[in-house]
């Protein structure tokens, strides 16, 4: 058993780094569960065919291929935002600022009457969320010591599941 696993949870939760990791995990779980689970249930209730649901489900593809643009997230500076927040948090903030309206616009679409627009919104939410995940994972590795990675990963996953639960998945 390493030293980090012996630290009481109360001590861990007082550390602002670990609280940030939990809340970033929560922010990650909210949109991803929308794209993976809640979306297909909603489309089924709207009476869409299984083929249409399957095609819209392909919008989750960015989660599987986000490693392709991870180097850009790692190196591309976001102007003054990077200067104020740093490389990782600027990407997280930028993704959050774009995710909120994308989720709202997706929610305002009727899949029955504007399936293409709805599908594009789902793809955009997925892309932004997958990009945010890249930045969140990099941030976690950057702010923690190697012996804290396990606790950090546990809190991130707990946060993710909390976010997924909150969106009804």
Which stretches of residues belong to each language-model region?
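C-terminal ends and interior cores of transmembrane alpha-helices
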Residues: 78-79, 90-113
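Core transmembrane helices of Major Facilitator Superfamily
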Residues: 32, 64, 124-136
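Helix-loop boundary and gating motifs at the non-cytosolic
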Residues: 3-63
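Central cavity-lining transmembrane alpha-helices of secondary-active solute carriers
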Residues: 53-79
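Glycine-rich segments within core transmembrane alpha-helices of 12-TM secondary carriers
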Residues: 63-67, 150-169
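Loop-to-transmembrane helix entry/capping segments in MFS-fold secondary transporters
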Residues: 50-51, 141, 146-155
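Intracellular juxtamembrane helix-capping segments at the cytosolic ends
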Residues: 39, 130-144
């Amino acid at each position: 058993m390493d030293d980090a696993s012996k630290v009481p949870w109360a001590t861990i939760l007082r550390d602002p780094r670990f609280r940030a990791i939990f809340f970033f995990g929560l922010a990650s779980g909210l949109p991803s569960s929308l794209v993976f689970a809640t979306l297909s249930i909603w489309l089924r209730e709207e009476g869409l065919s299984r083929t249409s649901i399957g095609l819209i489900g392909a919008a989750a593809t960015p989660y599987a291929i986000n490693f392709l643009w991870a180097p850009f997230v790692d190196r591309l500076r976001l102007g003054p935002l990077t200067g104020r927040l740093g490389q990782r948090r600027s990407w997280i903030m930028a993704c959050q600022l774009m995710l909120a309206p994308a989720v709202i616009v997706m929610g305002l679409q009727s899949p029955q009457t504007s399936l293409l627009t709805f599908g594009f919104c789902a793809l955009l939410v997925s892309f932004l969320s997958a990009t945010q995940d890249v930045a969140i994972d990099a941030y976690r590795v950057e702010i923690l010591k190697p012996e804290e990675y396990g606790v950090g990963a546990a809190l991130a996953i707990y946060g993710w599941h909390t976010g997924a639960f909150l969106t009804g998945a």
